[in-house]
Amino acid sequence: MDGIKYAVFTDKSIQLLGKKQYTSNVESRSTRTEIKHWVELWNSYEMNSHRLPGKGRRMGPIMGHTMHYRRMIITLQSSYSIPPLRKKRT
């Protein structure tokens, strides 16, 4: 489970918490099958993931990009819960 970066707390993800759906970012090079194996440890019954587009950053004349992440949404069974994931430092 080292590939899980941090939990995501946006307006949409907070609404999904009421439906027992947890949102977190993982490393972009992780595959769906690897993520599926991590999720099986939490006794979930559904997992969805997608890649987030990187944003452009400019430092003078040079154009760069921010890090790319993959976001996963885990839906748990009603009787299970997961421990809190570590938060992103700001």
UniProtKB/Swiss-Prot annotation:
Record-annotated disulphide pairs: none
Region (Coded by second part of gene): 47-90
GO terms assigned for molecular function: mRNA binding; rRNA binding; structural constituent of ribosome
Annotated GO biological process: translation
UniProt KW keywords: Chloroplast, Plastid, Ribonucleoprotein, Ribosomal protein, RNA-binding, rRNA-binding
Keyword Coiled coil among record annotations: no
Record localization: Plastid, Chloroplast
Regions annotated as coiled coil: none
InterPro entries recorded: Nucleotide-bd_a/b_plait_sf, Ribosomal_uL23-like, Ribosomal_uL23/eL15/eS24_sf, Ribosomal_uL23_CS
The keyword Nucleotide-binding belongs to this UniProt entry's keyword annotation: no
Record family assignment: Belongs to the universal ribosomal protein uL23 family.
Assembly notes: Part of the 50S ribosomal subunit.
Function noted in UniProt: Binds to 23S rRNA.
Name listed for the protein in its UniProt record: Putative large ribosomal subunit protein uL23c
